[in-house]
């Protein structure tokens, strides 16, 4: 399950799932970070993409906002279907799957929808300069923003004390299928679901 992050921001206290208040970019300018979030080292790799030293001393941050590509490289199963090696979907079409067998690597997309929860919204560009409404990922959006609360009451950086980012992923429901039965698995039915994620900071 490979995801490409293009921007990582800290959100100040008062932020919600729908709003990153006074966002502070802590990722490198003009660079992206690909993470295989199914690997055991995923949390460390994702965490290293952000530089906590950029945080304001004494400011409480309670959410993180991640901008990432809608395109994922995925291997897995959903319902009666499995991903098929070499298959590629698009923003407007799911990828073809297979019934049973060993899952192969497919290119899947987070689908267009106006009914996501408010912690997600689409973005035309990689830096979130032009975004859709909360809960909406539209046909012109190449990326999406994802807001997640920071566990343990948030992050407040002290002078000379920069904690380590810990990101725990759950990809058990990362692959989605839109069939309703094994007979349709070979059609265009495979898409990307959002992964489960827990974000914390440790000294």
Predicted feature locations:
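A short, solvent-exposed, low-complexity linear motif enriched for acidic/polar residues
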Residues: 1-203
């Amino acid at each position: 399950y490979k995801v490409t992050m293009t921007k990582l921001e800290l959100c100040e206290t008062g932020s919600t799932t729908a709003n990153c208040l006074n966002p502070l970019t802590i990722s490198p300018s003009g660079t992206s970070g690909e993470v295989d979030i199914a690997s055991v080292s995923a949390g460390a790799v994702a965490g290293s993409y952000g530089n906590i030293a950029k945080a304001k001393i004494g400011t409480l941050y309670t959410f993180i906002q991640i901008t990432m590509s809608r395109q994922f490289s995925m291997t897995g199963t959903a319902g009666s279907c499995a991903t098929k090696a070499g298959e590629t979907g698009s923003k407007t079409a799911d990828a073809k799957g297979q019934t049973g067998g060993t899952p192969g690597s497919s290119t899947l997309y987070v689908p267009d929808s106006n009914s996501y929860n408010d912690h997600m919204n689409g973005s035309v560009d990689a830096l979130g300069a032009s975004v859709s409404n909360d809960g909406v990922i539209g046909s012109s959006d190449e990326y999406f923003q994802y807001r997640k609360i920071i566990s343990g009451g948030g992050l407040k950086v002290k002078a000379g004390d920069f904690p380590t980012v810990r990101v725990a992923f759950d990809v058990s429901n990362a692959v989605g299928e839109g069939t309703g039965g094994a007979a349709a698995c070979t059609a265009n039915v495979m898409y990307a679901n959002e992964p489960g994620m827990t974000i914390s900071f440790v000294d």
